[in-house]
Amino acid sequence: VKLASLAMIFIFVRDASDVGVYIVILALSLIGGNLTLWPHLRVLLTKISIKELHPLRHFVPTVSLFVPQIATQIYLILNKNMLGIFAGATSAGFYNQSDALVKVVLGLVTATGTVMLPHVSNAFAKGETKKVNELLYNSFDFVSCLAIAMMFGLAAVSKYLGTMFYGPGFGPVGLALMIESIVIVLIGWSNVVGTQYLLPTNKVRSFTISVVFGAIVNIILNFPFIYLWGLYGAV
């Protein structure tokens, strides 16, 4: 499906006026990819009684997991909006471009959380505390090694990366990247503690409080930092 959609993009998308065709191809490829999974569901799924379903008892735990995501999205949106209000739309644009590049690197660092979460959950469910500690120590060492290397690597090339990706008018993105590269290590450690420890060990309340508290502190500090340093204060 992916190869077919890629071929159609090269064949049918010729210039900027073909945006509609491009959107249709992407939508059809997504639908087609999902439809290819349906024939296999008959082997995996079994019939169940509707009376045996109790969706409401899962609602509160699900909401508690959803709150940190809401808090994170709110303060990310407020970062850009506050920067646009206090420092102008240009600074908000520079921040957005810098943040996009950092998120690409962060995707590699935080991917370990997706891998480690089921392993730590399984060990904790079996009462294997020693194994949980071992997994977390190994993960912390790996994430630290990877994140610190990426932080210094990104900071080293940040001066040229902004203009290389976005053009000569995006010089301020370079310094913003250099400053923001620090969060690669901080978010990497946060991922180990939050996603790989607090969530698997059923300490969702502690995880939620830490994320919400961090979001509130970030919003409060934004006022003086953005007022004094503009783009670099928001970063």
For each predicted feature, which ranges?
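Alpha-helical transmembrane segments of multi-pass membrane transport and lipid-handling proteins
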Residues: 35, 133-189, 216-223, 227
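Interhelical loop/hinge segments that connect adjacent transmembrane helices in multipass membrane
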Residues: 16-26, 32-76, 115, 119-134
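Interfacial/gating helices of multi-pass transporter permease domains
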Residues: 19, 57-65, 83-103, 130-131, ...
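Helix-capping/transition residues at the boundaries of transmembrane alpha-helices
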Residues: 12-14, 84, 121, 198-199, ...
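Short runs within selected transmembrane alpha-helices of multi-pass transporters and secretion channels
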Residues: 1-6, 22-39, 68, 72, ...
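Helix-terminus/linker motif at the lipid-water interface of multi-pass membrane proteins
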Residues: 11-15, 73-104, 122-123, 159-169
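Helix-loop junctions and terminal segments of transmembrane helices
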Residues: 98, 102-140, 144-147, 194-200
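Short helix-kink/termination motifs in transmembrane helices of multi-pass secondary transporters
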Residues: 7, 62, 66, 70-82, ...
